[in-house]
């Protein structure tokens, strides 16, 4: 049922894949935004598939170290694969490799079997030997000088051996108890794993529903772009066409400024020319009066006496310079040109250009109006896609399949709960058996400790062997009892230990360690191992497609990383559901809808004929016929031939050289008069000349290329108009394609998000890897490590029973009461 559920996810993934193919890559419109689909709701898995043994881990490490010494060879991957392929026939043909790998186990097992077989025989022979008063059976002890030293050495060695055996039995007991306690923890692990499977099954429908519901985000954004098609598509068309239209309109608009500037300049020329003509006449008259008055003043008799004659002569020679320099009366007026410009300005070109700009700026509205039917068609298509997705989701038995899967989990849980009592009962029997084995050792240890205790406490060094006390004798008997039980139990213990060692050691080396190093997965993933016709057994079993690149290790690793079962099981390779949800059809449908888009911009008039006539009239106003050279020549002459202020200052200086009198006073009066003329008449005329100069130069610049400028403006406007009216198809198609791809891009984002979600977030298969890890924890961590540590501790005890037997027999001689002793005559 689980794989059926997984196949459902595949359907959604392939659906998204085919739509993505239809959304081919074209330059995306800048208006596209990244959609936010939110976060897929996810459950929380409780299982923590990690085992930390705690303090007993030290014993586990000792056991592992012992197994490494016994079996240091690497995992025989090739041998295992050959054995599996040949149904263990390879073992017969390659027995040498098997023996080489198992050599450590074989040697240890052989020693164990030898121990098991020989020890009862040795014990029997030992008993018979002692019955014949041999092998220490004679109740006679020879007196030796080093008896005390030997007794102390034997006591120390036996005590050390006994402590070692005690440590071993404690190790075995701890392992036995750990196994029972961990089996109780097994229930928690199993329960959490089954709970995670419930979470997996319960959250999956909600996740799928969430993926489906996020189509609303796509639809909402697409509707937004469709409803704003004028702003988006029309704006882009407007922007692209504006690269040629705006410069043309700006140039036309700048001509209106040129017209106004030309009018202002002509008016300035006309006014300043009239002002200059009138002003120079008045100035000429005033200067003539000053000249005549100065000549009359110089007729004064003072000019006869030295040094006045020289001064008067200089003044008289400079008087002719008091006259105007420019003759503005000869300059032609610009009335005709001004009148023509005024006639041109009667037509408001700026208003005409504004109408053209407004018409061009109406492009978004025109696009909105002309694409209304197409937009409505795409909206209907959106609804159809949504209906198809909804109907397709209803076709899939997601809820029913997952409900069956949930019931299967519940049934499995119930069955597991039913066998818990049997497991507990079996564990109890196992525990009893292990405790019995430990008790055998404990019984021997008890006799050893009691024997040592009674022997040490009851020993009297002054007593002869035949007169030893009851306590000392009892200690010796305890030691011999321990020897007897050692012979009785040790071969049984060694037999059990050997069997457990062979089974547990090989399982540890051939299963648990390879699982930790992931070599076991390499074996499982060996091509044609499980089935000679299947390259990979998982896809061969699930999908009957053994060539699919799906291995046990890849499945485990993906689930370990908590990826979705969709990607872990490579479900995108199973079904072709084009007949259900062929997304490329949708992209073609969207493209087909936009193929009928025809945006006609011929209604846009950038510059009406009246405006063109107006521009032509402006170029024919005749400002280029003005005699700019004559104007500039007169302007450059200045107002007067000589600077009146300088002349007045010189006149004052010359008057100061004369003696005081009427002539000096008259000359100074004339100097002041000249200054007044300069201030009141020359300065205003100079300002008018400056204005005239600026205006003439402006008109000269304007007229120099006016016809060419007008021609360029009209050509630019005509070119822009032709682009809009006849050649805008390329721009419209280009921007329409971008807009269309923008719309399709939202679907692509949705599909990419679905793919990513299916791969990483939907139906994450962590519970599957947790189950594998849990089996490893239960089998290797809980069961095998504990059992291996049990035989390791018990084996240590059993081995040290041999020195314990020897030492106990020898030490018992020093504690038991003898029947005879050596007697020496004095």
Curated annotation (Swiss-Prot):
Record has Glycoprotein as a keyword: yes
Main location: membrane
Key words of the record: Cell membrane, Cell projection, Endoplasmic reticulum, Glycoprotein, Membrane, Transmembrane, Transmembrane helix
Cellular-component GO terms for this entry: apical plasma membrane; cell surface; cilium; endoplasmic reticulum; endoplasmic reticulum-Golgi intermediate compartment; microvillus; microvillus membrane; plasma membrane
Keyword Transmembrane helix: yes
Cellular compartments annotated: Apical cell membrane; Cell projection, Microvillus membrane; Endoplasmic reticulum; Endoplasmic reticulum-Golgi intermediate compartment
Membrane protein topology class: Multi-pass membrane protein
Sample GO molecular function, one term: cholesterol binding
List of glycosylated residues: 178, 268, 286, 327, 388, 404, 576, 582, 617, 693
Transmembrane segments: 50-70, 106-126, 153-173, 439-459, 483-503
Biological function: May play a role in cell differentiation, proliferation and apoptosis. Binds cholesterol in cholesterol-containing plasma membrane microdomains and may play a role in the organization of the apical plasma membrane in epithelial cells. Involved in regulation of MAPK and Akt signaling pathways.
Family: Belongs to the prominin family.
Protein known as: Prominin-1-A
Source organism of the structure: Danio rerio
